[in-house]
A protein has these predicted regions:
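Short polar catalytic/cofactor-binding loops
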Residues: 92-96
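Short glycine/Trp-rich loop-beta-loop segment that forms part of the substrate-binding cleft
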Residues: 88
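C-terminal motif of bacterial Sec signal peptides marking the signal peptidase cleavage site
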Residues: 22-24
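N-terminal capping/interface segment
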Residues: 14-15, 289
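Bacterial signal peptide processing site
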Residues: 26-28
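Bacterial N-terminal signal peptides that target proteins for export
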Residues: 2-13
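Extracytoplasmic/lumenal domain signature
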Residues: 31-77, 81-83, 98-138, 143-215, ...
């Protein structure tokens, strides 16, 4: 891609901050309640930016920042372009990764029914990490969009639409290396499938401003190269690819992380120990800055997704490092050692004007037995508020090691459960339990209850609210079970079993959920 001058003028401007509680689009309010009013306050962006500081803990992070341009590239605004949309354009929907997807049910549901199922291709290629087949893996979340008339007309010029193209569309990236556009109503292919080049394990991302689709590759076929790519949806073509980075401090160029746009820039963490910052145009990306880092002499990979509060970005990595980065400068603000591999994405919630982040680790480097450390941290300085230690094990399954702990991303409670945080865990035989949906107090980390599974669970839970503001949590496990749990009590109100591993995380649209499995299928469920 040709080098170009900065895409936008960097000038002083005013940020528009909309303090909005939940609406029909499913926007998350600070307390998780309903309110149709919207308060709009104009505040200079300089007053909203969090300070460019570095706490003593950040000294543990040895880093370099490389800038392409001689001019600074500060964030242009602090808008959450994802939370303000009814679309699901990235993993867990918004920048804070705490969104209400918009799942709604009536009363207390009693059934989970299959509306349709979609079959993916199957890839039998032997890679350095085995045969991946089809369906979806971890995190594998679908994307969802409801297009306008103008957008639908623009897509027609691509020549890629099928007879089943419609207003509501899903996109799923598969382990088989193909990308599928699916009609949300019918479950039929709505565009020609995309060739994504390699195994895709993570969740892609739709650009909230341009018709760009971003996809990170997870495993290379036949020992070839892998990296990250962008597709121009108006052309239905790949228009950007970035493979192995010769300057990376870690030699593994996978990108399982789902990138996000913050302040006009695309931020994309890599498993090569690097955080990338790009300028975007239609079909184009231009790198403007990178941060490369080591902790204790090691450059770990980032499989989790970037969680963002204002100009601070939070992520965990393969060595349990939890790092806060100022996205204006790409410099670390604080660091927290959470002991072990942290692939689950950090989630954030503002309480009394202060951001707090929640995350937990796996039992990987600890050995066959260890602790999943679930923590709540102050997002401004990294100070620990509480820690819950949950015993877990690492086990061998059909010749492969299955780490214990948290692979999923926590769900912050809504409605009548704003005092709870929910998480799927892999106990792997610790306390005689394989998997659990656990509900913890956000105040002190006390375990309120746990729903036991007969298999482990990597899939992230999602919320549904009824007309009485009661929360129901939908959670999947590796045995193919889909459960709807009453958030307040832990009672399983209904469930179904598809018999295939749900590693992937679902999305909610109205009273439906869409999720893929390792068995080559994508399912749409209706909750009644």
């Amino acid at each position: 891609m040709k080098e170009k001058e900065s895409l936008f003028m960097h000038t002083t401007f005013i940020a528009l901050i909309a303090l909005v509680l939940l609406t029909g689009c499913g926007r998350r309010g600070r307390q998780g309640s309903y309110n149709d009013s919207t308060a709009v306050v104009q505040v200079p962006i300089e007053q909203l930016m969090l300070p460019d500081t570095a706490f003593a803990s950040a000294d543990a992070v040895k880093y370099v920042v490389e800038n392409t341009d001689s001019v600074a590239t500060p964030l242009r605004d602090l808008d959450d372009r994802y939370d303000d949309s009814c679309r699901v354009m990235t993993f867990r929907k918004n920048l804070m990764r705490n969104a209400d997807f918009g799942g709604r049910v009536q009363g207390t549901p009693t059934t989970i029914e299959v509306a349709w199922e979609f079959s993916t291709d199957r890839d039998t290629t032997h890679t350095s990490h085995g045969v991946w087949g089809g369906g979806t893996g971890w995190t594998g979340q679908p994307l969802y969009a409801k297009w306008t008339d103008e957008e639908m007309q623009a897509f027609r010029s691509s020549g890629a639409l099928t007879a089943d193209f419609g207003r509501e569309e899903l996109f799923v990236a598969s382990l088989c290396g193909k990308g599928y556009f699916i009609n949300f109503e019918t479950g039929k292919l709505s565009r020609q499938k995309l060739d994504l080049g390699n195994v895709i394990k993570g969740t892609p991302s739709l650009d909230p401003d341009f018709m760009n689709l971003y996809v990170g590759q997870g495993v290379a076929r036949k020992g070839g190269a892998m990296g990250c790519e962008a597709f121009d949806l108006l052309k239905h073509q790949r228009t950007f690819y970035f493979g192995p980075d010769p300057k990376a401090w870690r030699n593994w160029s996978a990108f399982d992380s789902s990138p996000v746009v913050v302040g006009g820039y695309l931020f994309w963490p890599g498993e090569n120990g690097t955080l990338y910052k790009y300028e975007r145009r239609q079909g184009e990306l231009r790198r403007v800055s990178v941060m490369r880092y080591r902790v204790r002499g090691v450059a770990p990979g980032i499989e989790s997704c970037l969680c963002v509060y204002r100009n601070y970005g939070y992520f965990g990595d393969n060595h349990g490092n939890i790092i806060c980065v100022n996205l204006n400068t790409m410099r670390p603000v604080w660091y927290y050692d959470n002991h072990d591999d942290s692939d689950g994405t950090v989630v954030c919630c503002e309480e009394d004007g202060v951001p707090y982040v929640y995350t937990a680790c796996e039992v990987d480097r600890q050995g066959e037995e260890g602790i999943c450390y679930f923590v709540k941290l102050n997002g401004l300085n990294g100070t620990r508020v509480w820690e819950r230690q949950i015993p877990c094990k690492r086990v061998e399954l059909t010749g492969k090691s299955l780490d214990g702990g948290m692979y999923s991303t926590p769900l912050l409670g809504l409605g009548d459960c704003t005092d709870l945080v929910f998480v799927n865990l892999c106990r792997n035989g610790a306390d005689h339990v394989m998997g659990q949906l656990m509900a913890l107090s956000t105040a002190d980390g006390t375990i309120r209850y746990a729903v036991n599974y007969k298999e482990f669970a990597w899939s992230s839970p999602i919320p549904f609210l009824n007309e009485n503001n009661e929360l129901f949590v939908l959670a999947c496990d590796a045995a193919g079970n889909v459960r709807l749990v009453q958030g307040k009590t832990g009672k399983v109100v209904c469930q179904t079993c598809m018999g295939s591993n749900f590693e992937s995380s679902p999305i909610a649209v109205g009273n439906t959920a869409v999720v893929g499995c390792r068995g080559g299928k994508i399912y749409k469920f209706v909750i009644k």
